[in-house]
């Protein structure tokens, strides 16, 4: 049985760290570098850049 290449990651807001976090999965084979996505921050009430946390 294959172990798979998908791994769970945490995305954290860069503008206000600690206020908004998202959990998602990514494929390590296709995206070896860290994810950066624009996601909604409910505390700031706007879309902000979220980066993959170590």
From Swiss-Prot:
CC annotations in GO: cytoplasm; ribonucleoprotein complex; ribosome
SUPFAM superfamilies: Zn-binding ribosomal proteins
Family: Belongs to the bacterial ribosomal protein bL33 family.
A GO molecular function held by the record: structural constituent of ribosome
Name of the protein this chain belongs to: Large ribosomal subunit protein bL33
Gene3D superfamilies cross-referenced by the UniProt entry: Ribosomal protein L33
Pfam families in the record: Ribosomal_L33
InterPro entries for this protein: Ribosomal_bL33, Ribosomal_bL33_sf, Ribosomal_zn-bd
Record-level GO BP terms: translation
Organism: Salinibacter ruber (strain DSM 13855 / M31)
Gene that specifies this protein: rpmG
UniProt keyword terms in alphabetical order: Ribonucleoprotein, Ribosomal protein
